[in-house]
Amino acid sequence: MHLDAALVSAVCGAVGGWFVPALIGRVPEPTPDPEPKPDAEPKEPYTSIAALPGLAWKSAVVSAACAGLVGAAVGLEWVLVILVPLVPLSVALAVVDWRTRLLPTRLVLPATGVAILLGLVGWAVTGDVDDLIRAAIALVVVRSVFWALWWFHSAGMGFGDVRLAALLGFALGQLGWGEVVVGVYSGFLVFALPGLLLAIARRDRGLLKSAFPFGPFMLVGALIGVLVGSAVWSSLFPAWA
């Protein structure tokens, strides 16, 4: 455990998390659907989400905790410069997706571009191109997997999830293939929990068909990948570790 990196990351995460409401409030509203579904509920405005009571301090606490865990797992490495800023962004995306079932392109694509740029800077600083190559391959592979899932079952997954998959693939790829595989797979496992737990608690199998936004669970899975991906991968496939 890297306590120095954990402390620095937690402080940075807390500061970034405090500005989550401001970030959400500046996201432009999407273009209205020309043919909305008759039973579609009105979208909650981003400004209303940004004004939720206590969102700033709650986001700061969650971001600090998650960033601290990331720092403790990774240590004072260049990849931390890529990962820590993604923590408050991930909190913002999770909040927005949970309440609107949308992952704003204005947040995901610029973040992906910045992550790639920082990866290039890391290559220039450290001279190690292996992490960058692995991250680029992971971006393409993970995005392609999610694109295929979206193409064959678009009702269960939005294209925002595909864009987010590219960002997470690149970020996890900076660490290793264990983090990529465990991070992506964990997202699907965690996604299955809410409906299952509700169905068990209420003894209603119909709740298994309840729809939940996928983005927040992808982000939780990515965090799991960062924290235990390498260890899980090494224990399952020691020859590939």
Question: Over which residues does each language-model region extend?
Answer:
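A membrane-topology feature that recognizes alpha-helical transmembrane segments
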Residues: 1-241
